[in-house]
């Protein structure tokens, strides 16, 4: 009997939809969605209740590391000055490691640029390339002219769209890598200069009137030390 009862067609029970006047509010929330939202809300409320209790029963004289690592300024805790946290030798080692990483990334970008340029060098504008041939007589000149026309016809073959899209994507990637390589080169130069300025020895910054070709960049001169 159960199989016969299941064989009787029944109307499909559809989910309630949002009323026409409230359609701008999106899909109507179902009971299971309300359960998830309510559980999340009550969980957050319980967490806030526990935190409020901890704050209420906290001993203000309880030891905290900020008591020795910070000081009070205008009623607020400020971390102590960390200027002398590292020695000069430790700072030099840290900067050297950073410079090495920047140099490695710069060289990696340069290698990728070379590979992309090598793969795209034969897909550029062929019309700008011109070759000059010298013929001995008119007959040879006609042959050279016919060969040039046939080569130009081959070069003007329409490239498929998918290949053209890949080429455009590769050119955009190449331009982006060139920009990143330029930024990394500038960063490496600046970091190398800062590293040299941290070394011992008297130095001074040259003025623009002391330079042959001033370009706005800082130029330093070190005092020559007598070698023993």
Swiss-Prot record:
<dbReference type="InterPro" id="IPR007144">
    <property type="entry name" value="SSU_processome_Utp11"/>
</dbReference>
<dbReference type="GO" id="GO:0032040">
    <property type="term" value="C:small-subunit processome"/>
</dbReference>
<feature type="region of interest" description="Disordered">
    <location>
        <begin position="192"/>
        <end position="211"/>
    </location>
</feature>
<feature type="region of interest" description="Disordered">
    <location>
        <begin position="1"/>
        <end position="23"/>
    </location>
</feature>
<dbReference type="GO" id="GO:0006364">
    <property type="term" value="P:rRNA processing"/>
</dbReference>
<comment type="similarity">
    <text>Belongs to the UTP11 family.</text>
</comment>
<comment type="function">
    <text>Involved in nucleolar processing of pre-18S ribosomal RNA.</text>
</comment>
<dbReference type="Pfam" id="PF03998">
    <property type="entry name" value="Utp11"/>
</dbReference>
<dbReference type="GO" id="GO:0009561">
    <property type="term" value="P:megagametogenesis"/>
</dbReference>
<keyword id="KW-0539">Nucleus</keyword>
<feature type="compositionally biased region" description="Basic and acidic residues">
    <location>
        <begin position="12"/>
        <end position="23"/>
    </location>
</feature>
<dbReference type="GO" id="GO:0005730">
    <property type="term" value="C:nucleolus"/>
</dbReference>
<protein>
    <recommendedName>
        <fullName>Probable U3 small nucleolar RNA-associated protein 11</fullName>
    </recommendedName>
</protein>
<keyword id="KW-0698">rRNA processing</keyword>
<comment type="subunit">
    <text>Component of the ribosomal small subunit (SSU) processome.</text>
</comment>
